[in-house]
Amino acid sequence: ALWELLQAGKLYGDVLTCTGRTMAENLTGAESHDREMIRPFADPLIDRAGFMVLSGNLFDFAILKTSVISEAFRARYLSRPGSEGVFEARAIVFDGSDDYHHRINDPALNIDEDCILVIRGSGVVGWPGSAEVVNMQPPDAMIRAGKQWLPTLGDGRQSGTSDSPSILNVSPESAVGGGLAWLRTGDMI
C-alpha cells in the first residue's frame, strides 16, 4: 500500500526514515502482486470514499468518517436550505468512556436528535494509546424508538466497523488544552 502511494506521488520518497534509508529505498521491491487486495491508487474500489480532514474553531484538524454518511443522515443533518452541508447541534459532553457509560441514559441530559455526542480525554495524551471510544450510541430510549445513531465528536479514535457518522482524532486534544476542553453540555456546535 505504501508503494502505491509513493508511485502516485503521495509520499515523499527522499525523506530519511528510522532505518537510516529513504522512504523510496525502504519501499524498493514492495509492489503488491495481488491487485484485488491492494488496489492501484489510480483504480480505487470506491471514488472519494472514507474520510475527510476538517478544521475549525474547536480544533486544528480532525477526521470526518464520510463513508457512513447515509442519505437519511444527509437529509436530517446536512440539508438545511441555504446551509447545505453544514449542521448545527447541541453538545452533550462526556469526560471519557466511563462518564459516557454512566450518564448516557440520564434523562436530565435531554438528549434528542438535535444533539451531538462529544467524548473528550480519549486522545493519545488523555488516554495513552488513544482509546477506541468515539463510537458512541444514543441513549437506550432513542434506540428503542428506532434511532440507531447520533453524530459524534471526540479526540480519541473509533473502530473501522462503526457505522456512526463521526468526527474523530480531534487535535489538539482536550488533555493538552484543545478546544474540546472548553466545550460544555448545551453549547451549540
Q: Model-derived features: where do they sit?
A:
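Catalytic or ion-coupling anion/metal-binding cores of large enzyme and transporter domains
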Residues: A1-I189
